[in-house]
């Protein structure tokens, strides 16, 4: 009887872990980090160990963990979206939709550049306001954040929009209407810093 119980217990030892959702290189890296689960009982997995391994990887947006009895684990990962590029102390990073900074490489050069200082999580909230507006985030080439809390954006046509610190959504929609109005097609600077006051400059 003891040998039967012991045999069943051994069958529940994890001997296979599958990681999907990222590049082969990143999947393999996470797989190596999860090596500590091999030969652990599938019923007694330390969830904090799993969370620590997965949450320290800034490229991960979310994940699902599935136990496949008797001895396998499957980790399905959703990669974070890369929103923009920023420079911190001379080092370039991507800003992810998960509110984290991700090591930069030379892919995704069409992302907007962020100048100034802003927390990654605050930047994600900023993009959500843009999504609510008529503006297309993909048409933005540069974003400037100032210590006052105000920001400017430049679109891919080179037009600079100086936004109000307050009523950001209203300012964005107003800028969109001006840009798409034939009368103002030559305006290169749209100054909306003061509420209910518009200054257009052709230069």
List PLM regions with ranges.
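Charged, solvent-exposed interaction patches on well-folded alpha/beta domains
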Residues: 1-203
